[in-house]
């Protein structure tokens, strides 16, 4: 099935934003564990290790801030979905590590991503 052109363009920008975010976070010393973890509850863009902490990362891209910046789109509903998906992932592990939820924004006007550690909590 072929995707509509607008959806293809939007999806490719999202993929590029995730690659840029991943590269930036690896430069900051984080190690990739999983990318695009899916389950019935939702998706987590990046799961990484920062020293001894497991980090669940939401990547946001916005071309402009007409409807709020990239972080404005991570509302309470989206946060609950990410937390529920993270709990599903944690059930696959033998031991539950320290965890945090980060957000990283890729803005078309900025060369450096904006990274918020502990962006939200359960």
UniProtKB/Swiss-Prot annotation:
InterPro entries: Restrct_endonuc-II-like, tRNA_endonuc-like_dom_sf, UPF0102_YraN-like. It comes from the Bacteria. SUPFAM superfamilies: Restriction endonuclease-like (SSF52980). Pfam families: UPF0102. GO terms for molecular function: nucleic acid binding. HAMAP family: UPF0102. Belongs to the UPF0102 family. This is UPF0102 protein Ping_1176.
